[in-house]
Amino acid sequence: MANNTRSVLVVGLGRFGSSVATTLDMMGQDVLAVDKDGELVNRWSSQIPTAQADMTDVMALEQINASDFDTAVVAIGDSVEASVITAGNLLDAGISDIWAKSVSKEHARILQRIGARHIINAETDAGKRVGHLVSGNYLDYIELEGAYNVVKIHTPAHVVGYTIEDARVHERFGITVVGIKSPGKEFEYGSKELIMHRNDELIIMGKQNQIDRFLRG
């Protein structure tokens, strides 16, 4: 998606972490997935870029050049201690955009206190959804049955200043603009005469490939 590629370090290749990493990879993001478990690394190495390393070890961060990444996702669920130490190490390495999975309220509180910017609830936030949010293209993302998704995005540059009707978003891209939220204003349902402004938040619905095309223009 145009001009929005990020380098993302995913720590932990369990079910959640592997889902985040594969989603980001499919979206064209620059991903490296890391786990200390060699079997997990081998299992995923043919699908996504991987490395075997223990991120609680500062030296391991240096070996994979962790400081070069824009964003990190701490997807460690089997050890609160390892999760917190890893998040702290990544912050110390200069990665300010940290997404960290929590397994309890207490875990979430600790992660927040050390500076993790986004806390992920392990029970309610599916890995695929988090992958889309981490990519930076979506403000929110809900996957529906039947291959349809509802997403919240900022207005793409190619439709700024156009009404929904004039932009022909449904005819050109197959998506539906459900509504628009302008800064300081109430949410408005997506009537055809509404103008899409630069800082508006759009709620749109469509299949993933249709949404991707709309974002790219």
Give each language-model segment a name.
Residues 1-217:
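Cytosolic regulatory regions of ion transport systems
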